[in-house]
Curated annotation (Swiss-Prot):
Signal peptide: none annotated. Keywords: ATP-binding, Cytoplasm, Decarboxylase, Gluconeogenesis, Lyase, Manganese, Metal-binding, Nucleotide-binding. ATP binds at residues 211, 230, 246-254, 295, 331, 447-448, 453. Involved in the gluconeogenesis. Catalyzes the conversion of oxaloacetate (OAA) to phosphoenolpyruvate (PEP) through direct phosphoryl transfer between the nucleoside triphosphate and OAA. This is Phosphoenolpyruvate carboxykinase (ATP). Binds 1 Mn(2+) ion per subunit. It comes from Histophilus somni (strain 2336) (Haemophilus somnus). The keyword Protein biosynthesis does not apply.
Length: 538
């Protein structure tokens, strides 16, 4: 048993006093009872669905709130963090100590005198580099979410648990003084790296806790020479490891959940001297338009102990996965063992030999697959391109390009080139090959079928792409296969999907100019300038 007096004292050191009761690392059974209790109202209330999973709503925040993210500026962080600037805007906005103390006071006051859920867990499967994380919340389903998403400690590990980082979730409290403090709004997601504390106020979105700790791993690990990656990963029966980078909605979770391969994890990984390891103990899958036919493994994972967010639940308790009226970003979190085919007992494997960059190109320009040179690998990793099409966010009706460094700029705490350097070094050491895979659209106006994309991934993983005859795509100078087993050959060169190739040419020139403009921010040093040649020619 954990010594609860010790936990109470540690909370007191943070400023949380007069705790009525601590519910420490409750079982799933207890969490189910707690989050579906009669009398719960508003966003605290969980609804049991016919699958057995509980569904909750997160209110107006159905995604992260990057405009409300801050990091305390101090001696430790001033020269290490990739701070936002007018020249290159990002989400790492500096916060002074005075404002931090004020926000910390708001959250600790909110959590004081309450019955609290305290979850002690790990972020990172390797004992040497993992963060021991303590999450403190007054909301049962938030405790359920982090129990799903972080690595659950053994009883023995709990005995000697000493938190490196504490997440204090005060979703019920907002900041009345935000204007005077020069902040974006009354909501806040703030980090003090020196203190080892994350504060959340005003937003109920569960992903703030998950991605908050990812941002912290992205701070600590690359400084130790360990690659820290926004990617999914799996391993074949011969021990061959593949990693899949990509922004939200490009197919990381879907494509890495493969019946022929064991899943290491679906979103956050490190790569050290021993190989690739998961940061998490669960998966956080998008559920919009989910079906048993298209994604059987994820569909089956939605059962008791899974937690659905912002889905539409019908009168009879069934879920309408096609209904995006609350948000397109409907989600489910579940413990990783809800997927049958996973690496056990620890989510880690050897060095990666295949590195796949997923992009969903709504312009219809990029090929469904191309093999990258080492220079192109760095270029496309730093570019982190994808594009949204109508309907993914309010008010967007045409292709909108997103360039997100390292396929995860929102979570980078250090400068993007630091992640690129560490990744390319790891790839060099393991002899890994890199590929750019477009899961988006082509000249037909339709999205490339998941069947063709899976065929492409199979060809990469089984090595058959290596023996394919290759052609070259102009403007982008990308190497593209002329034929692959199980893939419609008519789609491999995107120009062939247009009735008139001049249409492709015009779109390609437009997209190339956007790549070039985006990359200007990296051309401030010799190394960045040297990579320009690896990109498209506008």
């Amino acid at each position: 048993m954990t010594d609860l007096n010790k936990v109470i004292n540690e909370l007191g050191e943070l400023g949380i006093y007069d705790v009525k009761e601590i519910v420490h690392n409750p079982s799933y059974e207890q969490l189910f009872e707690e989050e579906t209790k009669p009398g719960l109202a508003g966003f605290e209330k969980g609804v049991v669905t016919t699958s057995g999973a509980v569904a909750v709503d997160t209110g107006i925040f159905t995604g992260r709130s990057p405009k409300d993210k801050y990091i305390v500026l101090d001696e430790k962080t001033k020269n290490t963090v990739w701070w936002t600037s007018d020249a290159a805007k990002n989400d790492n906005k500096p916060m002074n100590q005075e404002t931090w103390q004020s926000l910390k006071g708001l959250v600790t006051k909110q959590l004081s005198g309450k019955r609290l859920f305290v979850i002690d867990a790990f972020c990172g499967a390797n004992p040497d580099t993992r963060l021991a994380v303590r999450i403190v919340t007054e909301v049962a389903w938030q405790a359920h979410f982090v129990k799903n998403m972080f690595i659950r400690p053994s009883d023995e590990e709990l005995q000697n648990f000493k938190p490196d980082f504490t997440v204090m979730n005060g979703s019920k409290v907002t900041n009345p003084n935000w204007k005077e403090q020069g902040l974006n709004s009354e909501n806040f997601v703030a980090f003090n790296i020196t203190e080892g504390v994350q504060l959340i106020g005003g937003t109920w979105y569960g992903g703030e806790m998950k991605k908050g700790m990812f941002s912290m791993m992205n701070y600590f690990l690359p400084l130790k020479g360990i690659a820290s990656m926004h990617c999914s990963a799996n391993v074949g029966k011969d021990g061959d490891v593949a990693i899949f980078f990509g922004l939200s909605g490009t197919g990381k979770t879907t494509l890495s959940t493969d019946p022929k391969r064991q899943l290491i994890g679906d979103d956050e990984h490190g790569w050290d001297d021993d190989g690739v390891f998961n940061y998490e103990g669960g998966c956080y899958a998008k559920t919009i338009k989910l079906s048993a036919e298209s994604e059987p493994d994820i569909y089956r994972a939605i059962r008791r102990d899974a937690l659905l967010e912002n889905v539409v639940v019908r009168e009879d308790g069934s879920v309408d996965f096609d209904d995006g009226s609350k948000t397109e970003n409907t989600r489910v979190s579940y413990p990783i063992y809800h997927i049958d085919n996973i690496v056990k007992p620890v989510s880690k494997a050897g060095h990666a030999t295949k590195v796949i960059f997923l992009t969903a190109d709504a312009f219809g320009v990029l090929p469904p697959v191309s093999k990258l040179t080492p220079e192109q690998t760095k270029y496309y990793f730093l570019s982190g391109f994808t594009a949204k099409l109508a309907g993914t966010e309010r008010g967007i009706t045409e292709p909108t390009p997103t360039f997100s460094a390292c396929f995860g700029a929102a979570f980078l705490s250090l400068h993007p080139t630091q992640y690129a350097e560490v990744l390319v070094k790891r790839m060099k050491d393991s002899g890994a090959e890199a590929y750019l895979v477009n899961t988006g659209w082509n000249g037909t106006g339709k999205r490339i079928s998941i069947k063709d994309t899976r065929g492409i991934i199979d060809a990469i993983l089984d090595g058959s792409i290596e023996s394919a005859e290759m052609g070259s795509l102009p403007i982008f100078d990308l190497a593209i296969p002329k034929a692959l087993p199980g893939v419609d050959p008519a789609i491999l060169d995107p120009r062939d999907t247009y009735a008139d190739k001049a249409q492709w040419q015009a779109k390609a020139e437009d997209l190339a100019s956007r790549f070039v403009k985006n990359f200007e921010k990296y051309a401030t040093n010799e190394e960045g300038k040297a990579l320009i040649a690896a990109g498209p020619k506008a």
